[in-house]
Curated annotation (Swiss-Prot):
Activity regulation (UniProt): Activity is very sensitive to oxygen. The activity in growing cells is enhanced when selenite and molybdate are added together to the growth medium. Tungstate replaces and is better than molybdate. Selenite is incorporated into the enzyme. Requires a sulfhydryl compound for activity. Inhibited by cyanide, EDTA, hypophosphite and mercaptoethanol. Sulfite inhibits the activity with NADP but not with methyl viologen as electron acceptor.
EC number(s) on file: 1.17.1.10
Catalyzed chemical reaction(s): formate + NADP(+) = CO2 + NADPH
Record-linked SUPFAM superfamilies: alpha-helical ferredoxin, Nqo1C-terminal domain-like, Nucleotide-binding domain
UniProt-annotated location(s): Cytoplasm
Highest taxon listed in the record's lineage: Bacteria
pH effect on activity, per entry: Optimum pH is 7-9.5 (with NADP as electron acceptor).
Keyword terms, alphabetized: Cytoplasm, NADP, Oxidoreductase
Name this protein carries in UniProt: NADP(+)-dependent formate dehydrogenase subunit beta
Any GO CC annotation of this UniProt entry: cytoplasm
GO molecular function, one term: 4 iron, 4 sulfur cluster binding
Amino acid sequence: MGEVVFSTWGGKVVDHRGGPSGGGPSWAGEFGGRQLKAFIGWDGLVVTDPAVDLLAALQAYYQAVQGESCGRCVPCRVGTRVIYNVLVRIAGGEGLPSDLDLLRRVAWIVRDGSLCELGQAGAKAVLDFLDYYSEALRPFLEDSGRVAGGQRRPGPGGRVQVLASGRVLVGNDRGKGAAAASPAAGLTYKPFVTAPCLKRCPAHLDIPAYIDAIKDGRYEESLAIIRQRTALAGVLGRVCVHPCEENCRRGNVDEPLAIRGLKRFVADYEVKRGRRPVAVCGGNLFTGPWRPAGQAGGEETTAVTSGKKVAIIGAGPAGLSAAYQLAGRGYKVTIFEALPVAGGMLAVGIPSYRLPRDILAGEIEAIKALGVTINLNTRVGVDVTMDQLQRDYDAVFIATGLHASSRMGVAGEDEGYGGFIPGVKFLRDLNLDRCPSLEGKVVAVVGGGNVAMDCARSALRRGAREVHLIYRRSRAEMPAHATEVRDAEAEGVIYHFLVNPTALVAEKGNIKGMQCVRMKLGEPDDSGRRRPVPVPGTEFFLPCDIVVPAIGQAADLSFLDGRIEVGKRGTISVDPVTLATSVPGVFAGGDIVLGARTVVEAVAQGNRAAVSIDQYLRQGTTSPTVEDELDAWLEKVGVYDPEEDVGIYGGRPRQAERVAPLAERVKDFREVEGGFDFYAGRAEAERCLRCYRVGMMVLAGEGESNG
């Protein structure tokens, strides 16, 4: 890794131009095998090579910023162009002394007058350059650009270079400043665009772009942007836990944008007009937390026509996502699904009051329309073997998910009592119409995650007289999403916090209740949460007819026959970046690798697996991409500051999505949330600050420049 020569990143100046380099933030050394020489971006400048020509690099940077300007406001649209033109003039040896003051004034206007973050943050790089390099540059402008008798008198020099070391060089090619926007010999410029929300989204959807389209009423275009990276817009618009909203800079002002709700808004727009979801993947396997500047949606790729085949085990969100990307790329994809329906946990784990089955089915049909074959009721290891798949297909992706429940470890758990129904089975039977009526029953659900919430709320809808939820920690430690916790309580679920079951109690083979003990919180465990500890003498009996343990999920890996390496947690071991297993040509992703996680994380894993499978089928090997390297690097550098003072007035609260009346929604499994109406959806999109940030890497080695 190159030591820092000069940096203004994060408002902390590190200046070693006149002495040994070092200090400052940690910057990754290589991208695609090329050493990082400098970085220009939304929070300043960082240079690790004193010989980098900052003046030339700034031209390329502002060319990229100009290319990303939406054109809605004059300061950004015109101001960034003026900055670029003046930099070109100075670099070409045609600069005036007044140009430095002009640059500063225009940069201030861009920073303070732009409507979105692109311009506001984009001005910082040139302002930092002026603060620390203008005095070294000024004498050369005076020599090369005096005006006499109304005529410009060329100076003795030519093209001007401002090295990061502080030296200014003048060549003999005066007037060639425009060429300086191209990389110097031995360097490559790589501009890119990211955003706090885009970076936080596991699937790296281009959130500002699709919300921008909603602002303009371009709903079909908005949906097409989403579908570049996922076919499951309507699904994620309902069940995503929206981590992107945690990185929403609007939340620093008043409330985060309803990003998930806006995704649903455009997906519903299509459905309400009687249109079937249409896949627009197009084989674009760009999955990074950013996109190349000037290329909305990512780099285009050429479809494969080799006829190579990929087998996918499991039609859940990870398997469907991999199939979507690979089919769009031209591969022949077949999914093997043990269940009688496609969708995995989307179909048999999430109740229909959260995810209507017609929404899921429509998006699966769009994936099948790409040529994907889904073989239902086909269990690998029974109906077809792993040997057969490896023999008949060029690559295999395992995405079976976690369809077994974790054990509670209490007395009576293995006795086969009537009324003891593991949570995953409870939801599967419910969604496949195999669950008996719970009319008049008392149901006890054990657990504090989203599966436990789904079980509890579903039990109410199946007619349970009472539903108790037992959780061994406090409410604050519950892993379930806060909205689910709130809604379950509002619907009538009775919470028992700091309580743990110790034994099942049965009579004539049927559950009659549970022995429980009260808990207190001790020292933190491996999860970072305080460990629950039993309180002696607090044992009590909780009467109930049904016990539904939902404390975790487990994998069934019997079909692997021990040939693929499995980790200590009972999940498949893979390369954490490429998702390759211990067997060449076999990949795995989703919950079968991560453990019980979220739908959007499974989508991201499916997308990433498609990249590796494409690499493997083209090259015979897999390796991390530049996107992977930049993802890790941006994690360290930081794209979002939760303490940032955004500098605008608030007072535009988040729009409310429609919700079914409480008294009505527990009667059946009709969808609870109704999404935004037309006016609320547009109003919510208008709250977006469009927090795009343009960055540019200056890399060693010549190559194609995106600048």
